[in-house]
């Protein structure tokens, strides 16, 4: 219940921030960056509530998913939801501050945010019970509970390492951090999937 309240507070804070700052913002707001500079600008009425609405939809979706989840998985889902909502809110604040004329290193913020998200999410991933919503979900991890535990424990470590690398590199790589994030996350998913399949074959090869 406490984690649910935190989610609601973050979403409400996002809407409240947009409402309070609306009159102070210019008529055009950046929504995309290249080299830490705005690359795409859209009119204020269209963009200022995009992130708050996305956050609301995201929260409602996760809330519906938790209804039939076990207590442990429900807690992990809300943890993931809260982390993502915080990341989106920080991105919203960064966008609004840039629009108000403040200098904000958006590439660094995104890199650090995603890195921390992966560290927290990866660390909690190993605690997930077998399910179809969170964790490393493949036909073989869902089929064998032991493979699920081994695969998610391995993926948890890989994602934490991936998060640390992204967080550190975000201080040095500038606009390339987005590409680096995509490559590292995809690599982590591929390695984790292959590792879980290896566990499955090792445990079930003689059956």
Swiss-Prot record:
TM spans, by residue? 5-25, 47-67, 78-98, 100-120, 150-170, 171-191
InterPro entries, alphabetized? DUF1648, SdpI, SdpI/YhfL
Query: What keywords does the record list, in alphabetical order?
Result: Membrane, Transmembrane, Transmembrane helix
Q: What happens when the gene is disrupted?
A: Results in increased SigW expression which is dependent on SdpC. Results in weaker growth (70% of wild-type cell density) on LB medium, with more pronounced effects on sporulation medium (15% of wild-type). Concomitant deletion of SigW results in greatly diminished growth (5% of wild-type on LB and 3% on sporulation medium). Over time, single SdpI mutant stops growing on sporulation medium, while the SdpI SigW double mutant eventually lyses. Deletion of RsiW restores growth of the SdpI single mutant to near wild-type levels.
Q: Briefly, what is this protein's role?
A: Immunity protein that provides protection for the cell against the toxic effects of SDP, its own SdpC-derived killing factor, and that functions as a receptor/signal transduction protein as well. Once SDP accumulates in the extracellular milieu, SdpI binds to SDP, causing sequestration of SdpR at the bacterial membrane.
Q: What topology in the membrane does the UniProt record assign?
A: Multi-pass membrane protein
Q: Name one GO biological process term.
A: response to toxic substance
Protein name (record): Immunity protein SdpI
Protein location: Membrane
Q: What GO CC annotations are associated with the protein?
A: membrane
Q: What induces it?
A: By Spo0A during nutrient starvation, through its direct negative control of AbrB, repressed by AbrB during regular growth when nutrients are plentiful, and also by SdpR. Induced by expression of SDP (active peptide of sdpC).
- Which Pfam family, any one, appears in the UniProt record? SdpI
* Native species: Bacillus subtilis (strain 168)
